[in-house]
Curated annotation (Swiss-Prot):
Keywords: Cytoplasm, Fatty acid metabolism, Isomerase, Lipid degradation, Lipid metabolism, Lyase, Multifunctional enzyme, NAD, Oxidoreductase. Heterotetramer of two alpha chains (FadJ) and two beta chains (FadI). The keyword Transmembrane helix does not apply. It comes from the Bacteria. This is Fatty acid oxidation complex subunit alpha. One of its GO terms (cellular component) is cytoplasm. GO terms for biological process: fatty acid beta-oxidation. Signal peptide: none annotated. It comes from Salmonella paratyphi B (strain ATCC BAA-1250 / SPB7). It catalyses: a (3S)-3-hydroxyacyl-CoA = a (2E)-enoyl-CoA + H2O; a 4-saturated-(3S)-3-hydroxyacyl-CoA = a (3E)-enoyl-CoA + H2O; a (3S)-3-hydroxyacyl-CoA + NAD(+) = a 3-oxoacyl-CoA + NADH + H(+); (3S)-3-hydroxybutanoyl-CoA = (3R)-3-hydroxybutanoyl-CoA. It is found in: Cytoplasm. The gene is fadJ. Its EC number is 4.2.1.17, 5.1.2.3, 1.1.1.35.
Length: 715
């Protein structure tokens, strides 16, 4: 047996070499440049052992194969040439694995992503477990990159060009059965027999060649390929709005390899990787990745968390049902739901059933796993079953006396250590805790809708909240699969506070005569997933505008919205998607009809609907108000750091990830440019655009929010 720091070679008695991958001191395996020499030493031993029948690569980690290449390697590259060299080194190593003279099998359990899948693709066959943790994909596009170690060339030849383009352009991850159907793996087996199944496959002298499906064979021909690439380019441009250069390069590189051969394809891949690594988009996306990783490690406070064995939820509505699902099905914690009637409890239970049943239908989980997770959720119309709950989340109506009553009832019916967490989106946590016997155990935990999809939560301590309460709540959020940021107990907290002026300005432009679709298209072009008017429809016009008076009372006229317009829309029973009537027309099932704006909206608010502003002007007016408010939040310590502010905006409202978040974007523009732009807009549109003191100070001192890759605290 020969041991290296990350790889261990063991030649079995049946002459099959097993290479175990185990990066020391790390929970997950990642590929690093320094491992190349270690792998080559093992490959040399394999080539020299003429008695070997086959090779199996397998992870020694409990639940991952290889999660990807170490992204820090890219950050160390000073220029495109160095990044290109890094890619070529990876390509060469994979080529050496593929060139081994005996069958080489990748035995995959857990995450097999990025460079990990590229290594598996270099093997002659792949076999994986049927475990829910097993996923395969090439997510490099999400970092503004493309697979740089041969993935763009091997994957299309293995699964077909159409499937490969879909996987690489989206970064989607396939589960075991999906990977088998696509031809990405050759077999799916229980984890208990993974190694032996891989060994048996390695012993086969001749491995049968897989035939691509008819559709993929047609698309592989010159005519089919030309049509496919033309269509993919068009659809990709529509989706990315030209904001993600990696997608264009991915298409070019794959097409080059298929049209001109693998050698040209590998060369194009390496060059594109090097160039993309230096783009501001990739740098911003990688910064978001590292920031989110840091946030997930942040305990929230220095105190150790308290016990967290079970959770209670008050309210079985849309939010309560979603919170129950992430707590039980993501966090694995028993959940007890209390509602004033059984209808609410049944709604919450059905919410989880529907989500889990969808997973069963898609073969992501088994029916037995669905039943196991559902068994964690129970309900009642009183506080039976609440006495031992460690934390209770309130998800009732936005009514202060009602929430204060909930605090009193929880303190009366639950344990002395039970934490009360309010899912309020607008009410001050200090006011909710005003009459509490144990105010140190009251905290805000603001989820975003739909709970099962939105990754962010805001954790909001008030002045008396204890450090342990913060730590316990942050721990729960992480168990729920969320990315938590701790924010101050000020009106609107962080996300809603920066979102409100952005939406207000969109409504204001609507009253000036700008068309709904023009406003939305301008912000989508800027990089948001949906425009502000459509977002208001999705959230619910009644819900989305409810916070405006709260913010206006706290911060003054800059948060005022055209009240008559909002009132006219609400009085016409327009709530958005949820009741089928908003700014857009909706079908019976709540689906938009080609995003068709309801023309009656213009008459309702008394305008003609004729756009005069350019898309750039529309986007500038909305975005600059958001940025200015984000800078105020930094100054007032509403957020703890620029890092948290960027994560909150990207994960909470879809701020364009390729810009890195509002604070990285402001740093890229420069505080001087920010102040000048805001002053110009203030002269045109009024004092709501006046640059905040934080930006003026930073412009004078030539400071930035981020310093040397670290977070800057508010001053």
């Amino acid at each position: 047996m020969t041991t290296t720091s990350a790889f261990m070679l063991n030649v079995r008695l049946d002459n099959v070499a097993v290479v175990a991958i185990d990066v020391p001191g790390e929970k997950v395996n990642t590929l690093k440049a320094e491992f190349a020499a270690q792998v080559r030493a093992i490959l040399k031993q394999i080539r020299e052992n003429k008695a070997l029948q086959g090779v199996v690569f397998i992870s020694a980690k409990a639940d991952n194969f290889i999660a990807g290449a170490d992204i820090n390697m890219i950050g160390h590259c000073q220029n495109a040439q160095e990044a290109e060299t890094l890619a070529r080194q990876g390509q060469q190593l994979m080529a050496e694995i593929q060139a081994l003279p005996v069958p080489v099998i990748a035995a995959i359990h857990g995450a097999c992503l990025g460079g990990g899948l590229e290594m598996a693709l270099a093997c002659h066959r792949r076999i994986c477990t049927d475990d829910v943790k097993t996923v395969l994909g090439l997510p490099e596009v999400q970092l503004g990159l493309l697979p740089g170690s041969g993935g763009t060339q091997r994957l299309p030849r293995l699964v077909g060009v159409s499937t490969a383009l879909d996987m690489i352009l989206t970064g989607k991850q396939l589960r075991a059965r999906q990977a088998l159907k696509a031809g990405l793996v050759d077999d799916v087996v229980p984890q208990t027999i993974l190694l032996e199944a891989a060994v048996e496959l390695a012993k086969k002298e001749r491995l049968a060649q897989r035939t691509l499906p008819v559709r993929e064979r047609i698309l592989a021909g010159p005519l089919g390929r030309a049509l496919l690439f033309r269509l993919v380019r068009k659809k990709t441009a529509q989706k990315t709005q030209g904001n993600y250069p990696a997608t264009e390069r991915i298409i070019d590189v794959i097409e080059t390899g298929l049209a001109q051969g693998s050698s040209s394809g590998y060369d194009a891949e390496a060059r594109a990787f090097g160039e993309l690594a230096m783009t501001p988009q990739s740098q911003a996306l990688r910064a978001i990745f590292f920031a989110s990783t840091e946030v997930k490690k942040d305990p929230g406070s220095d105190a150790p968390p308290g016990p967290l064995n079970s959770v209670g939820i008050l309210g079985g509505g849309l939010m309560g049902g979603g919170i129950a699902w992430v707590t039980a099905c993501k966090g694995g914690l028993p959940v007890r739901i209390k509602d004033i009637n059984t209808q609410g409890i049944n709604h919450a239970l059905k919410y989880s059933w529907d989500l889990l049943e969808t997973k069963v239908r898609r073969r992501h989980i088994k029916a037995s796993e669905r039943d196991k997770q559902l068994a964690l959720i129970s309900g009642s119309t009183d506080y039976r079953g609440f006495s031992h709950r460690d934390l209770v989340i309130e998800a009732v109506f936005e009514d202060l006396p009602l929430k204060q009553q909930m605090v009193a009832e929880v303190e009366q019916n639950c344990a002395a250590h039970t934490i009360f967490a309010s899912n309020t989106s607008s009410l001050p946590i200090g006011d909710i805790a005003a009459n509490a016997a144990r105010p140190e155990q009251v905290i805000g935990l603001h989820f975003f809708s739909p709970v099962e999809k939105m990754p962010l939560v805001e954790v909001i301590p008030h002045a008396s909240t204890s450090a342990q309460t913060i730590a316990t709540t942050v721990k729960l959020a992480k168990k729920q699969g969320k990315t938590p940021i701790v924010v101050s107990d000020k009106a609107g907290f962080y996300v809603n506070r920066i979102l409100a002026p952005y939406i207000n300005e969109a409504i204001r432009m609507l009253t000036e005569g700008e068309r709904v679709e023009h406003i939305d298209a301008a912000l989508v072009k800027f990089g948001f997933p949906v425009g502000p008017i459509q977002l208001l429809d999705e959230v619910g016009i009644d819900t989305g505008t409810k916070i405006i008076p709260v913010l206006e009372a706290a911060y003054g006229e800059r948060f005022s919205a055209p009240a008559n317009v909002v009132a006219s829309i609400l009085n016409d029973d327009r709530k958005g998607r949820k009741n089928g009537r908003g700014f857009y027309l909706y079908g019976e099932k709540g689906r938009k009809s080609k995003k068709q704006v309801d023309p009656a909206i213009y008459k309702l608010i008394g305008v003609q609907g004729q756009s005069r502003l350019s898309a750039q002007q529309v986007a500038e007016r909305c975005v600059m108000l958001m940025l200015n408010e984000a800078a105020r939040c930094f100054d007032e310590k509403v957020i703890r750091s620029a890092r948290d502010g960027d994560i909150g905006a990207v994960f909470g409202i879809g701020f364009p990830p390729f810009l890195g978040g509002p604070f990285r974007y402001m740093d890229a523009l420069g505080p001087g440019e920010m102040v000048a732009t805001l002053q110009r807009l203030a002269a045109l549109y009024g004092p709501r655009y006046a640059p905040c003191e934080q930006l003026v100070r930073m412009a004078e001192r030539r400071e930035h929010f981020w310093t040397n890759g670290e977070t800057d605290q508010g001053n």
